[in-house]
Every structure is written in C-alpha cells, then in structure tokens.
Amino acid sequence: MTKHDEVARRQRRNFLRTAGGAALGLVATKDAHGQSEHAKAASQGTRRRDEPSDRGLWATWYDLPDTGRDAYLSWLHETYLPALLKRPGYLWAAHYATQNTETRSDLHHVEDPKVPTGFRYVLLIGAKDAGVFGNPAPVEIQAALPEQGRKMLAMRIGERVNLMTETSRCDGHAGNSHKEGPLGAPCIQIGSFNCPVEYEEEMLAGYVQVRLPAMCGAGSCVRTRKLNSAAGWAKHAILYEFASLEGFQRDYAVTNAHAPIGLKGHSVVPMLIHAPNGPNMATRIWPPVAKA
C-alpha cells in the first residue's frame, strides 16, 4: 500500500465516523421531539406545575340526630380528621352543612330504597389520587378505630359514600384570591348521578366545552371539578366551588341558565338520575372560614 493510499483510507474512515455521528445525532434529535419527550416526562416522576395535586376525592353524605351532634362534630373535627390527614397521600379535608333542604322536583332522583338518603352533611376528603383510598380502604380505616370512634361513626344516618377520581377541572376567577390551596372552598354545590350510557359522551362534552368554562368565568367561582366514581352508587359527580355563599347565590343559577350540559344547545339533564336529595349546596363548617 502506497503512502497516498494510506492517506486516502484514513480520510475515508474519518468521513464515515463523522457522518455516522451526525446521523446518530439526527435520530436523537427526532426522539427528543417525539416519543422520548414522553419517556423523559415519565422518567422524571414529577407532576407538571399545572396538573392538580389532589385527583382523588372521598365524598360522604349523611344526616345526624339532634342528640349527641355536638359531641360528634367535636370528635370529627378535633380527632378523626386530623389523624386521617396524617396518612400518606391524604391532602385535605372539608366538612360542610347543606343549606338547601328541599328536593328539586325538576330533576329525576333514584327511587331504589337501597341507596342511602343522607344529605344534611357533606364530608369531602382530598387525596393524591383515588388509589390512596384502596390501601387501606375507608372501611378498613374505620374498622380499626377505637370503640369510641366507631360509636361516633355509628351516629351517621343514611350514610352514602363515593370514592372518586377527577376527570376534568377548570380554575375560576376567584381562584387567584383563594389563599387555601386545594382545600375545598367556603361554599360548594355537589351533585352525584348516573347517566344512560348513550348520553355519556354528550354529557362529558357538555361539561368540558360549555358548563365548566362558563362557571369558571363567574366572578365568585374558585374551581369546578368533574369526577367519576371508583366506588359508590353514583358513576358521575360535579363539584362547583365558590368563594362565598353570597357569590354562589349571585352567580350559580344565572350561569347555568346559559350553559346547558350537552351539545348544540341540547341538555342531557332530563336523562340523569340523581342521588337522593341532591344536588346539595353547602357551606363549610370545618376548617372554619376566615372572616373577610
């Protein structure tokens, strides 16, 4: 081999090495803007800043007898809920007293006597996700309570439970001034219901495209959450959160009137089967609402 041939061979080898590196770089660039972006996000194991941290909701509706009510409320607020919030994945708890006591005659309510009818109190517990409520399950937590705690829970009348996962959320105008983070707002309206399967897609579209944006455009709305059930009678729920009772009374009905749950002006509400005595408008009794 001549000196000239050796130089030519070396130049060709360097060219192939450079070209190969460029090709690998091109492939890596393609992956970085395609599938590997998703892999990177997954491998980081961190939640996006705009993604809600409390996707799980444990909702309980119930009534209480007059006798022993104050003792029960003291136990719930001072003992049971603070202990519950020390568990991994549990983020917040809010206890509400229902303000509307008349059942709406324009809605279809379930007639099955097996579905509990409590509604005067609503207890909401937020968690990282609905899987938190599977280990341990609420029934396991409550069975492990000391005797006094089990006696307190036994005071609940018509108790109905749903364990839910959030499927859609809209943050409202009042969210910027809401200083309590994910904690349930001072005033809520919560509805739980079932829907014939042939209307479920339209219902979802109606909430996401129409109702949620409209409600979150109201001045007193903190946030609105559409939820689906992991356990419990109702397959669906909607949670509207407001900065105050006065704001709810001003904004809720007028907003609903112009935001039907459906497509092209159609409403699926007549097809829904609501939980007993629902939906429920309620104000928070714990944690206490700070005075303005």
What function would you assign to each model-found segment?
Residues 20, 36-37, 253:
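A ubiquitous, low-specificity "background" feature that marks scattered single residues
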Residues 40-292:
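Macromolecular interaction modules
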Residues 30-41:
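Signal peptide processing junction and immediate N-terminal pro/mature segment
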Residues 21-22, 32:
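Cleavable N-terminal signal peptides
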Residues 1-14, 36:
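N-terminal secretory signal peptides
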Residues 7, 28, 132-134:
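Short alpha-helical interface patches
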